[in-house]
UniProtKB/Swiss-Prot annotation:
Belongs to the magnetosome MamC family. It comes from the Bacteria. The gene is mamC. This is Magnetosome protein MamC. Residues 2-8, 86-124 are cytoplasmic. It is found in: Magnetosome membrane. Residues 36-56 are annotated as: MIC, when fused with the C-terminus of maltose-binding protein (MBP) or expressed as a fragment, improves quality of iron particles during precipitation experiments, binds magnetite. Changing D49A: MIC expressed as a fragment or fused to MBP no longer improves iron particles, binds magnetite. Probably interacts with MamA.
Amino acid sequence: MPFHLAPYLAKSVPGVGVLGALVGGAAALAKNVRLLKEKRITNTEAAIDTGKETVGAGLATALSAVAATAVGGGLVVSLGTALVAGVAAKYAWDRGVDLVEKELNRGKAANGASDEDILRDELA
C-alpha cells in the first residue's frame, strides 16, 4: 500500500508546517540554483537563504493553519484569515532574520570574519 504524505501531514499543525516548509524550501532552492548557475551568489549564500526560507515558510504555514482553525467561519473567512496570518508570520520571520543578520554582520565587521568562517564556527 502506498504512503500518502500530504494527508498524513495535514492531520496536525506541525505536519502542516512541515508541508509548508517543503514547498517553501523547494521554491527557495529552485531560485537559488538559478542564481548559483548565474554566479550571482555563493554556495554558502544559497544554503543559508534556502534554510531561512524553508523555516520561514513552515512557520508561516503552521501559524496560518492555527489562525484559520481558531477563527473558523466559512471558506472565504478561513482563506482570508489564513492569508493574513501567513503574510504576517512570514513578514515577522523575515524582519527578525534581517535584524539578526545585521547584528552578526556588525560583529563580523569588528573581527573581520567571513560568512564561511562564521558558519564553520557555528557548526563546530
